[in-house]
Curated annotation (Swiss-Prot):
The central subunit of the protein translocation channel SecYEG. Consists of two halves formed by TMs 1-5 and 6-10. These two domains form a lateral gate at the front which open onto the bilayer between TMs 2 and 7, and are clamped together by SecE at the back. The channel is closed by both a pore ring composed of hydrophobic SecY resides and a short helix (helix 2A) on the extracellular side of the membrane which forms a plug. The plug probably moves laterally to allow the channel to open. The ring and the pore may move independently. GO terms for biological process: intracellular protein transmembrane transport; protein targeting; protein transport by the Sec complex. It comes from Lactococcus lactis subsp. lactis (strain IL1403) (Streptococcus lactis). This is Protein translocase subunit SecY. The chain crosses the membrane at residues 19-39, 68-88, 116-136, 151-171, 176-196, 216-236, 269-289, 312-332, 373-393, 396-416. InterPro entries: SecY, SecY/SEC61-alpha, SecY_CS, SecY_dom_sf.
Length: 439
């Protein structure tokens, strides 16, 4: 189905241009992920670049952090900045609340604020991680460890992060899919070969012949688990609750009734990405403090455990963040107040529900139930592989396997739907003012 849609899409000039533009941007992203930042000893990075709290950053950047490349920070600062801006719109800063109600003009102001916050966070996080790596390693990671070197490396990494953010915006405007999600998708896909190699090395190289059958059983189990996760995730991500609506006034050609689709998981995979980004920066600071203060500082160890996927406390904290962000982002994606207002303006209503405040309360209750299902789903899919890796000592690929598949499937579904939308537009191009060009 996907390949058939892709084949049809390539026949449309505008769609073909968007696909090729997206591929070009992703090529530049992957190129930058292999260019190491000047002033860093890459060969000394192995000791610290595989720390558990950096797994998420390595995942979304396609191992760019492991190489300490130009794009090592990836979109993590932008994601954190987006969370901050969305929180500030919730009656915290009046100016941000005002902008959120100004339509397109307000959206531009909020985007600009997000960029400024991204710049500050990227600089702070870049210098912090560089200094932290230097403190945690027994070898010199920074060739000349002085404040000028830290500032230079921080500036380069910050520039790289801003460039990646700009790439995401360009994909939004001229390419396919949500820019940030597509870049994360590319990072995960690029990590697959190295992940497969690590499983092969661990399970098939330098093992006794008697252990080979168990290795094959592990691989079969891993593949079957991935298939199950793909099937369940695809089903849940596309499932929706259809809320019937009716029209108070009939106009020529208008339907007498319709429905309002609410997704079973309104937040998508954004909560998982948010939770991973939130845990990365504090964990870096704690690692740095613990190495500089000594390993016997109890409160530092406790906090570090709370942010590490390798402990049960850390897993529960990660799951809690996913649940909280699922509820938060569900109400960001589907605003009950605005939805009730729009229905009333359109002269439509939900049967047996009073328009206005009654509709708002009804949608809020329904959204809360759907978000609960979505939170449980995202939490389980993300946590079960991590727990399995911790209990049975499975390869690292397993720990974030659920998260990776969630993101890959969601981005793929969005891309297919967008392609189908363009093809549908082409089908009815004869009824539109600006039909899409072919050939």
């Amino acid at each position: 189905m996907f390949f058939k849609t892709l084949k049809e899409a390539f026949k449309v000039k505008d769609v073909r241009a968007r696909i090729l533009f997206t591929i070009f941007i992703l090529f530049v992203f992957r190129l930058g992920a292999h260019i190491t930042v000047p002033g860093v000893n890459v060969q000394n990075l192995t000791e610290v670049s595989n720390l558990p709290f950096l797994n998420m950053m390595n995942l979304v950047s396609g191992n760019a952090m492991q190489n300490y490349s130009l794009f090592a920070m990836g979109v993590s600062p932008y994601i954190t900045a987006s969370i901050i801006v969305q929180l500030l719109q919730m009656d915290i800063l009046p100016k941000f609340v005002e902008w959120s109600k100004q339509g397109e003009i307000g959206r531009r102001k909020l985007n600009q604020a997000t960029r400024y916050i991204t710049l500050v966070l990227a600089m702070a996080q870049s210098i912090g991680i560089t200094a932290g790596f230097q403190a945690m390693s027994s070898l010199n990671i920074v060739q000349n460890p002085n404040w000028q070197s830290y500032l230079m490396i921080g500036a380069i990494l910050t520039t790289g992060s801003m460039v990646v953010t700009w790439m995401g915006e360009q994909i939004n405007e001229k390419g396919f899919g949500s820019g940030v999600s597509v870049i994360i998708f590319a990072g995960i896909v690029s990590s697959i070969p190295s992940a497969v190699k690590s499983v092969y090395d661990e399970k098939f190289l330098n093992v006794r012949p008697s252990e080979i059958p168990m290795s094959w059983l592990f691989v079969i189990g891993l593949v079957l688990s991935a298939i199950i996760i793909i099937y369940v995730t695809t089903f849940v991500q596309q499932a929706e609750r259809k809320v019937p609506i009716q029209y108070t006034k009939l106009t020529q050609g208008a339907p007498t009734s319709s429905y309002l689709p609410l997704r079973v998981n309104p937040a998508g995979v954004i909560p998982v990405i948010f939770a991973g980004s939130i845990t990365t920066a504090p964990a870096t600071i704690l690692q740095f403090l613990q190495r500089s203060q000594g390993s016997n500082v109890g409160w530092l160890s406790t906090l570090q455990d709370a942010l590490s996927y390798t402990t049960w406390t850390g897993m529960l904290f990660y799951a809690l963040l996913i649940v909280l962000f699922t509820f938060f982002y569900s109400f960001v994606q589907v605003n009950p107040e605005k939805m009730a207002e729009n229905l009333q303006k359109q002269g439509s209503y939900i049967p047996s529900v009073r328009p206005g405040k009654g509709t708002e309360k009804y949608v809020s209750r329904l959204l809360m139930r759907l978000a609960t299902v979505g939170a449980l789903f995202l939490g389980l899919i993300s946590i079960i592989p991590i727990a399995a890796q911790n209990v049975w000592g499975l390869p690292k690929i397993v720990a974030l396997g659920g998260t990776s598949l969630l993101i890959l499937i969601q981005v793929a579904i969005q891309a297919v739907k967008q392609l189908e939308g363009y093809l549908l537009k082409r089908k009815y191009a004869g009824f539109m003012d600006n039909p899409l060009e072919t050939k």
